[in-house]
């Protein structure tokens, strides 16, 4: 079984991935952020580095999903191939950070890749307001994230809603996380696991 956790920057994906992996004894896989050689440059100059950053992420996510497809383990993945394309890369393109030519090349790469992999058995989307995202980003203190514009986060939120409603073809569980604190309140985690159990018939 393959579960994907989707959500904006600061929505709590990694924390929930860790907790669900422990709860269900699933194997967690995490997005490669620290190792992305373009990350610091990207936040300093979005226009110059967006295409390189997105291609790097696309390559890493494709490698992850290929490994998952060959594994017999139950795996939960922090951020999916598909949201990387239809949310983050599409947002960079819409904001003029990726040229028409580069985006066309990027989408052609994605179309080749997506034919080789399956959709998650369940996509869990953590929906969050921008103020909640900003609060979480400030708390965790990653230096390269502190200068992210509010407009950028709002653009990503809009893209996520469009992605979940109109573009993604698989099974989705939407969880509004603004009023949840599953890291410190067991009852909040149980609210989530009860929904997962119901959707997956566990």
Indicate residue ranges for each PLM-predicted region.
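Conserved lysine of the Walker
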Residues: 13
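P-loop (Walker A) phosphate-binding loop of NTP-binding proteins
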Residues: 8
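Conserved substrate/cofactor phosphate-moiety recognition/catalytic segment
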Residues: 22-60
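A basic- and aromatic-enriched beta-loop-alpha substructure that forms the phosphate/nucleotide-
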Residues: 61-101
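Hydrophobic anchor at the beta1->P-loop junction of P-loop NTPases
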Residues: 5
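Post-Walker A alpha-helix
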Residues: 16-17
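NTP-dependent small-molecule kinase module
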Residues: 134-202
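A glycine- and Lys/Arg-enriched "phosphate-lid" helix/loop adjacent to the NTP-binding pocket
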Residues: 87-158
């Amino acid at each position: 079984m393959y579960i994907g956790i989707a959500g904006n920057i600061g929505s709590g994906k990694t924390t929930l991935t860790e907790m669900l992996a422990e709860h269900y004894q699933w194997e967690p896989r995490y997005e490669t952020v620290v190792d992305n050689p373009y990350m610091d440059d990207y936040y300093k100059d979005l226009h110059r580095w967006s295409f390189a950053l997105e291609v790097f992420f696309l390559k890493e996510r494709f490698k992850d999903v290929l490994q998952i497809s060959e594994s017999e383990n139950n795996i939960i993945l922090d951020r999916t191939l598909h949201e990387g394309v239809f949310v983050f890369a599409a947002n960079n393109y819409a904001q003029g950070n990726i040229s028409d030519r580069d985006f066309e090349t990027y989408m052609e790469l994605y179309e080749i890749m997506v034919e080789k992999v399956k959709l998650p058995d369940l996509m869990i989307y953590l929906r969050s307001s921008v103020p909640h995202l900003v609060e979480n980003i400030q708390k965790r203190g990653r230096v390269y994230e502190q200068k992210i514009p509010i407009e950028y986060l709002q653009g990503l939120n809009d893209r996520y809603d469009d992605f979940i409603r109109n573009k993604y073809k698989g099974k989705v569980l939407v969880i509004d996380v603004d009023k949840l604190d599953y890291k410190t309140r067991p009852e909040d985690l149980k609210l989530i696991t009860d929904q997962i159990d119901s959707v997956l018939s566990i």
